[in-house]
Amino acid sequence: MKEQIQQLSAYQPGLSPRALKKEFGLDIDLHKLASNENLYGPSPKAKEAIKEHVDEVLYYPETGAPTLRKKIADTLNIDENRILFGAGLDEVILMISRAVLTPGDKIVTSQATFGQYYHNAIVESAEVVQVPLKENGQFDLDGILNEIDEDTALVWICNPNNPTGTYVTHEELEAFLEKVPSNVPVLVDEAYFEFVTADDFPDTLKLQEKFPNAFLMRTFSKAYGLAGLRVGYVIATKEAIHNYNIIRPPFNVGRLSEYAAVAAFEDQDYLKEIQKRNAEERAKFFEIPESKHFFDSQTNFIFVNTKRPKELYEALLKVGCITREFPIGVRITIGFPEQNDKMIEVLKNFDFEA
């Protein structure tokens, strides 16, 4: 057993609604608003694709998700050999970390961002350098630049960031990439890209033309509503993808996952409706005075800053909403209107100054 494994723990999902009801003595329906899933679910066309092809599950899938790869490549007007798929972005992060990191290497990222960057680096005996976020919840790109040296093998930028929901602009990311050594890959994790409405959000595909070391990651788990089918991908140089492919398990994206992802990707009208609903519901949270305690969000969740996260978590639970507690606040997945209205009422009546 690797020694460094001993300092890690397996991923711990939140308690189930049944367990929470028992622990808190609740006799109400509970709704899971803790994992940033799209509660409206996937496109009906994705569901139909699953039904249509369900009898094919006795066969192994085509390796590398070739139909989906070509669909995305054609849509984005890029070489399909620049795309690698994983069973969600978790596996993409694992494959990249395994392919690149060696003992003595280091990764540089933020102190409060997606934990799988740290986790996989430690597994590979790499050093993890975490730069604190700015007070507004944004990545401190200057702070990250100051930590990059000859031992830096990977830089991770979650944009928009999970769990804060904040983002770096196109201008900020471009200025950052100008200063990063060209041999250091910068992984830009855009898992929540489809929820963004900000005009100055980076066009990372465009930036890749100037900065080939900027690698872009996206997923079907969030806006496309396919979290249970595990499909994520990275767009990088052909050389990098060739090397990552050596690490990729042979049949890592299942048949039904690929069929559903293709159908979901083709149904952009449904995606636009999801985007519209999310933007409308997100705006409701920021209409209340208490929003001064929230980080700005370009995602399908709200991060609420509070010195009393446990109390806020339990107050939201009492109105039937399971959220995610952090040391400095609570992350709330944007749900259906009636769920959001309940949570907004709790936030309006919560004592943030206690």
UniProtKB/Swiss-Prot annotation:
Modified residues (N6-(pyridoxal phosphate)lysine): 222
GO MF terms, alphabetically ordered: histidinol-phosphate transaminase activity; pyridoxal phosphate binding
InterPro entries per UniProt: Aminotrans_II_pyridoxalP_BS, Aminotransferase_I/II_large, HisP_aminotrans, HistidinolP_aminotransfase, PyrdxlP-dep_Trfase, PyrdxlP-dep_Trfase_major, PyrdxlP-dep_Trfase_small
Keywords: Amino-acid biosynthesis, Aminotransferase, Histidine biosynthesis, Pyridoxal phosphate, Transferase
Record has DNA damage as a keyword: no
Disulfide bond residue pairs: none
EC number: 2.6.1.9
Required cofactor names: pyridoxal 5'-phosphate
Superkingdom of origin: Bacteria
Pathway given in the UniProt record: Amino-acid biosynthesis; L-histidine biosynthesis; L-histidine from 5-phospho-alpha-D-ribose 1-diphosphate: step 7/9
Reaction(s) the record says it catalyses: L-histidinol phosphate + 2-oxoglutarate = 3-(imidazol-4-yl)-2-oxopropyl phosphate + L-glutamate
Gene Ontology terms describing biological process: L-histidine biosynthetic process
Alphabetical list of PROSITE patterns matching this protein: AA_TRANSFER_CLASS_2
Quaternary structure and interacting proteins, as annotated: Homodimer.
Family designation: Belongs to the class-II pyridoxal-phosphate-dependent aminotransferase family. Histidinol-phosphate aminotransferase subfamily.
Protein name (database record): Histidinol-phosphate aminotransferase
